[in-house]
Amino acid sequence: MAKSSRSKTSKAWLKEHFNDPWVAKAQEQGYRSRASFKLLEMNEKDRLFRPGMAVLDLGAAPGGWSQVAGQLIGGRGTVIASDILAMDALPDVTFIEGDFREEVIYEQILMALGDQRADLVMSDMAPNMSGNSAVDQPRAMYLAELALDMAERVLEPDGVFLVKVFQGEGFEDYRKALQSRFKRVVSRKPAASRARSTEVYQLGFGLK
């Protein structure tokens, strides 16, 4: 019975995915995922990218956000992408495969940054969803906490932190944690986010 239920859920997801206008738009414009449009919209509102900056993209695969960063910054800055999953190469993006919680991967990230700190740390990480919010929400919050920890370690004092968070248990506490660490915190729900999704992006500007 459970297997049948999962099969129905998978079929429904596939139908939604292939009928999604943002997925079609991504394919037409050569972006790796619909997530690219979320970042493009947030950049229009918040001017996240500028020439010469250093960007760290956590949980980057398949590369939708790194692709945008690479295009907007080009060879005039540094874009570092990290994920435990493999990712096809992108122009002007340095990819580091592995778990950034591990010291060896963290050191590789620092080496890629060189003598600079990151101007923008961004995370679109999400766990593999089971459909059980009691399981999924803590996993999602844990990933957001990992991203925040990394941001505090590598960000410039006036840097920006962009992270995906899911509304639910732990969300308000996480937002308070951001407000205690950053001078300004704003929420964003891009048009390319699915309406039924509880995801909401948090932006922290300038470490306190």
From Swiss-Prot:
Residues annotated as catalytic = K164 (proton acceptor)
What keywords are annotated for this sequence in UniProt?
Answer: Cytoplasm, Methyltransferase, rRNA processing, S-adenosyl-L-methionine, Transferase
The places in or outside the cell where this protein is found are: Cytoplasm
Q: Pfam families from the xrefs?
A: FtsJ
Database matches in InterPro entries: RNA_methyltr_RlmE (IPR050082), RNA_MeTrfase_FtsJ_dom (IPR002877), rRNA-MeTfrase_E (IPR015507), SAM-dependent_MTases_sf (IPR029063)
Give the binding site residues for S-adenosyl-L-methionine.
G63, W65, D83, D99, D124
Query: What catalytic reaction does the record list?
Result: uridine(2552) in 23S rRNA + S-adenosyl-L-methionine = 2'-O-methyluridine(2552) in 23S rRNA + S-adenosyl-L-homocysteine + H(+)
Keyword Methyltransferase: yes or no?
yes
Q: Name one GO cellular component term.
A: cytoplasm
Q: Which GO terms describe its molecular function?
A: rRNA (uridine-2'-O-)-methyltransferase activity
- The EC number of this protein is 2.1.1.166
Give the HAMAP family listed for this entry. RNA_methyltr_E (MF_01547)
- Entry function: Specifically methylates the uridine in position 2552 of 23S rRNA at the 2'-O position of the ribose in the fully assembled 50S ribosomal subunit.
Name the family: Belongs to the class I-like SAM-binding methyltransferase superfamily. RNA methyltransferase RlmE family.
In its UniProt entry, what is this protein called? Ribosomal RNA large subunit methyltransferase E
Provenance organism: Alcanivorax borkumensis (strain ATCC 700651 / DSM 11573 / NCIMB 13689 / SK2)
Mind giving the lineage of the organism this protein is from? Bacteria, Pseudomonadati, Pseudomonadota, Gammaproteobacteria, Oceanospirillales
